[in-house]
Amino acid sequence: MKFSKIASDTYEKLQLGAGVFLTTFTPTTGTFEDSAIFGATDGGVSFSATPTFKDLADGIDNATLNLKELKRIDSWEVKMSGTLKTIDTTSAKSLLGAGTVNSNKVTANAELASGDFVDLWWVGDYGEKGGYIAIHLINALSTGGFKIQSANKDKGSFAFEYTAHSSVANADTVPFELYISESGT
């Protein structure tokens, strides 16, 4: 028997391309409006959902650590980061984390408002049958600040990092959702 094989459906389960960064997406139909595109990205996006664990046996003499019955999830850190190549006042306000827009002026605020937390989506192509992988960040807040990197004879870049948040009303809800659709709906 040879062990250097791959599953016969491997190429049907690949995520393809850079995907699109959105403000809204409808996973039941696999659709979005052009106006929902947050901005053009360069280099795709990076997503991580990392749990923090506690072990109830930790700190107890003679207790065995890493028993599955004593392991608990303390919290989740959910982040999405990347680089935008396009910007407008709406996305600039969002990148600030806390801000307001007045015509063409974007002002940073010293306090957070509930409207500073927004839902964001990343959606990428999946397989060869029109499928998608979608990641929904719930109550996302820009935690990477506002950054611009200009370049001689090139386009400017706006690095971003968003962190998803639970809320007091739903403290046990992990603030992201993952959808994998083979057919696009």
Segments from the language model and where they lie:
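Solvent-exposed edge beta-strands and adjacent loop segments
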Residues: 1-92, 139-157
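Beta-strand secondary-structure signal
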Residues: 79-83, 119-123, 159-163
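Intrinsically disordered, low-complexity regions of eukaryotic proteins
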Residues: 44, 57-63, 121, 174, ...
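Generic structural motif
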Residues: 50-52, 85-89, 125-129, 140, ...
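Mixed-charge, glycine-accented linear interaction segment located at domain edges/termini
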Residues: 132-185
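Short helix-loop boundary/capping segments
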Residues: 89-137
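Intrinsic-disorder/low-complexity regions
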Residues: 8, 54-60, 108, 115-118, ...
